[in-house]
């Protein structure tokens, strides 16, 4: 667990009344998501959807004898959790829709063994007004329960519209 991580997170998302209210929160921690279980079924479904069937992910017998001692989640599966983690952590009441705009500075810091529980820490890095809404840059740190360092860090850039 990282030093700025609360020991527990509420399962209810943090509510912000307006998108504009986030402008004053730049540089601050906004929310922590609930834990998400990464089981073999999720890994297998991701492999099926992406065509990445590397044995370290989908062959438990072979993976047990491999470098991690168990199957591990795809790095991109971990990254693909960003929308789920963000949506379960926070809600902006006046936002009608949002779209992904891009990613910056993505790093996979540690493997995610099957059976791990992950959660996201969300910190608002930037708020830029755009027509009809705002562009948000969120620093997301994905943590594995019981681990010292994050498994993935990324800056997620999204556009939210009111």
Per-region residue spans from a language model:
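Catalytic strand-loop segment that frames the active site of acyl-thioester-processing enzymes
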Residues: 4-73, 90
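Hydrophobic beta-strand-centered segment that forms part of the acyl-chain substrate-binding groove
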Residues: 64-70, 80-121
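A solvent-exposed, acidic/Ser-Thr-rich amphipathic alpha-helical stretch
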Residues: 74-78
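A generic structural signal for short beta-strands and their flanking turns/coil linkers
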Residues: 28, 32-34, 42, 52, ...
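HotDog/MaoC-like acyl-thioester-processing domains
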Residues: 2-24, 111-162
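Predominant activation on well-ordered alpha-helical scaffold segments within soluble catalytic domains
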Residues: 44-47, 79-83
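Generic structural detector for well-ordered beta-strands
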Residues: 31, 35-37, 107, 113, ...
